[in-house]
């Protein structure tokens, strides 16, 4: 067992993972600082902030960026494999923060209570299988947040009460089988939300009362068994139906007996 002392706390190396000795509390970091683990031998190049290597084996780096806008801060860091800990109190923008980090597998829970924009935050993070329950109470835009996360299997029930744009959120998340019943009462745009989610088996009855755009929402979700018909019936008969809904259910459920039966009852202009 190797021991690494950082900021007065003892850390031990358990295989390839850095853990805290004697306390579940992560090591304290300066404001606007994130601790990252990269593939052995990789020397990351950062376009923003100040970086320092904490350890060479495992390959740990601290990045400090004293700014509330962290958009694209770590995008396309293909050698990044873990977010160990972060002091992100006060950060407002995290749009495309980890986009294109195709080797990222592990993310710790960090402070997102002030974040308003998570657009494309994990876009194309194809190695992610799970995600922490981030505080999304202030977020209004989560469009393309998990677009192309082909390894993602589960999603927590985020607080989406302030979200207005949820479009393309899970496009081509082919390993996703179910999703929680998010609060979508403020959402206006659901277009392409689950496009190409071939693993999806059920569709929750989302609140569509404010939605104006549902186009391509479940396009290509061929293994859906239930839920499509109920959602169509709700959306099409609400006080103000969506004005855009072309291909909302194109091929949705076409590979399953019950799904195909529901699809047959949905009008052509919705599929």
Predicted regions and their residues:
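Negatively charged
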Residues: 22-271
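Glycine-biased low-complexity/repetitive sequence motifs
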Residues: 1-31, 35
């Amino acid at each position: 067992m190797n021991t690494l002392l950082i900021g007065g706390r003892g850390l031990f190396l358990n295989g390839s993972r850095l853990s805290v000795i004697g306390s579940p509390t992560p090591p304290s970091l300066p404001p606007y600082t994130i601790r990252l683990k990269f593939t052995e031998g990789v020397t990351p190049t950062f376009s923003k902030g100040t970086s320092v290597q904490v350890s060479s084996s495992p390959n740990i780096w601290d990045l400090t960026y004293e700014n509330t806008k962290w958009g694209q801060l770590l995008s396309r860091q293909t050698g990044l494999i873990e977010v160990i800990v972060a002091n992100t109190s006060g950060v407002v923008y995290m749009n495309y923060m980890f986009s294109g980090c195709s080797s990222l597998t592990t993310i710790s829970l960090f402070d997102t209570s002030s974040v308003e924009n998570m657009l494309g935050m994990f876009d194309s993070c194809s190695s992610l299988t799970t995600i922490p329950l981030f505080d999304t109470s202030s977020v209004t835009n989560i469009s393309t947040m998990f677009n192309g996360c082909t390894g993602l299997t589960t999603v927590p029930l985020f607080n989406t009460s302030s979200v207005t744009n949820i479009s393309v959120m899970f496009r081509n998340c082919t390993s996703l089988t179910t999703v929680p019943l998010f609060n979508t009462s403020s959402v206006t745009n659901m277009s392409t939300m689950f496009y190409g989610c071939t693993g999806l088996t059920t569709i929750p009855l989302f609140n569509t009362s404010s939605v104006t755009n549902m186009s391509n929402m479940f396009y290509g979700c061929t293994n859906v068994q239930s839920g499509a018909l109920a959602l169509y019936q709700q959306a099409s008969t609400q006080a103000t139906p969506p004005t855009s809904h072309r291909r909302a259910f194109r091929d949705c459920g076409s590979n399953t007996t019950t799904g195909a039966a529901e699809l047959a009852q949905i009008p052509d202009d919705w599929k």
